[in-house]
Amino acid sequence: MYEDLNDNQIKILHYMKSEISQKGYPPSVREICQAVGLKSTSTAHGHLSKLELKGYIRRDATKPRAIEILSQGDEQSPYIHKEIINVPIVGKVTAGQPILAVENIEDTFPLPIDFVDSESTFILTVKGDSMIDDGIHENDYVVVRQQSDARNGDIVVALIDDSATVKRFYREKDHIRLQPSNTSMSPILVDDVTILGKVTGVFRKI
């Protein structure tokens, strides 16, 4: 098996399979260099071109990290890469400023497209333990679909006093209740609130 590949190409192929299997998306070229011990990205690109030419992978040059691992005979393997979107990680939220303003974005994180249901999705780091009963802990990352409205029971990111907070949303008779999922904390009652988006996912570092 792999008689037509050199040692580095085999290492790259195995590394990409492992990363896609574990994470759901392929590594970057720089990550490939570090994992295999290559000194330059141009060398890695050369090996990737050979792997593509020999039918082991398929690439889309118009998209970042767009690589599919193919089995021999050009049949798709279980390691097929789904399209990846680089989702912005928002570091701060300021009243009167678009949430995705360049100055608000600290970094980006690649997520499979089926995990992201809107181009205006962003990621926010959770501060505090007000949502622990919903499995959302301090320093978790919440995936947020940007929208200005919410239904009762939605977990939302709301702007209060120039600060973003994650709570469950309830519109009641004469106020809005932002309910924490922590029995030791009281709800926040307000006449009106700015909704920045609805939480659609959560992940954390272990």
Swiss-Prot record:
<dbReference type="InterPro" id="IPR036286">
    <property type="entry name" value="LexA/Signal_pep-like_sf"/>
</dbReference>
<keyword id="KW-0678">Repressor</keyword>
<feature type="DNA-binding region" description="H-T-H motif">
    <location>
        <begin position="29"/>
        <end position="49"/>
    </location>
</feature>
<dbReference type="InterPro" id="IPR036390">
    <property type="entry name" value="WH_DNA-bd_sf"/>
</dbReference>
<dbReference type="InterPro" id="IPR006200">
    <property type="entry name" value="LexA"/>
</dbReference>
<dbReference type="GO" id="GO:0003677">
    <property type="term" value="F:DNA binding"/>
</dbReference>
<dbReference type="Pfam" id="PF00717">
    <property type="entry name" value="Peptidase_S24"/>
</dbReference>
<comment type="function">
    <text>Represses a number of genes involved in the response to DNA damage (SOS response), including recA and lexA. In the presence of single-stranded DNA, RecA interacts with LexA causing an autocatalytic cleavage which disrupts the DNA-binding part of LexA, leading to derepression of the SOS regulon and eventually DNA repair.</text>
</comment>
<dbReference type="InterPro" id="IPR036388">
    <property type="entry name" value="WH-like_DNA-bd_sf"/>
</dbReference>
<keyword id="KW-0742">SOS response</keyword>
<dbReference type="Pfam" id="PF01726">
    <property type="entry name" value="LexA_DNA_bind"/>
</dbReference>
<dbReference type="InterPro" id="IPR006199">
    <property type="entry name" value="LexA_DNA-bd_dom"/>
</dbReference>
<dbReference type="GO" id="GO:0009432">
    <property type="term" value="P:SOS response"/>
</dbReference>
<keyword id="KW-0804">Transcription</keyword>
<dbReference type="InterPro" id="IPR015927">
    <property type="entry name" value="Peptidase_S24_S26A/B/C"/>
</dbReference>
<dbReference type="InterPro" id="IPR006197">
    <property type="entry name" value="Peptidase_S24_LexA"/>
</dbReference>
<feature type="active site" description="For autocatalytic cleavage activity">
    <location>
        <position position="167"/>
    </location>
</feature>
<protein>
    <recommendedName>
        <fullName>LexA repressor</fullName>
        <ecNumber>3.4.21.88</ecNumber>
    </recommendedName>
</protein>
<keyword id="KW-0068">Autocatalytic cleavage</keyword>
<dbReference type="GO" id="GO:0004252">
    <property type="term" value="F:serine-type endopeptidase activity"/>
</dbReference>
<feature type="active site" description="For autocatalytic cleavage activity">
    <location>
        <position position="130"/>
    </location>
</feature>
<dbReference type="InterPro" id="IPR039418">
    <property type="entry name" value="LexA-like"/>
</dbReference>
<dbReference type="GO" id="GO:0006260">
    <property type="term" value="P:DNA replication"/>
</dbReference>
<keyword id="KW-0235">DNA replication</keyword>
<feature type="site" description="Cleavage; by autolysis">
    <location>
        <begin position="95"/>
        <end position="96"/>
    </location>
</feature>
<comment type="subunit">
    <text>Homodimer.</text>
</comment>
<dbReference type="GO" id="GO:0006281">
    <property type="term" value="P:DNA repair"/>
</dbReference>
<keyword id="KW-0805">Transcription regulation</keyword>
<keyword id="KW-0238">DNA-binding</keyword>
<keyword id="KW-0234">DNA repair</keyword>
<dbReference type="GO" id="GO:0006508">
    <property type="term" value="P:proteolysis"/>
</dbReference>
<keyword id="KW-0227">DNA damage</keyword>
<dbReference type="GO" id="GO:0045892">
    <property type="term" value="P:negative regulation of DNA-templated transcription"/>
</dbReference>
<dbReference type="InterPro" id="IPR050077">
    <property type="entry name" value="LexA_repressor"/>
</dbReference>
<comment type="similarity">
    <text>Belongs to the peptidase S24 family.</text>
</comment>
<keyword id="KW-0378">Hydrolase</keyword>
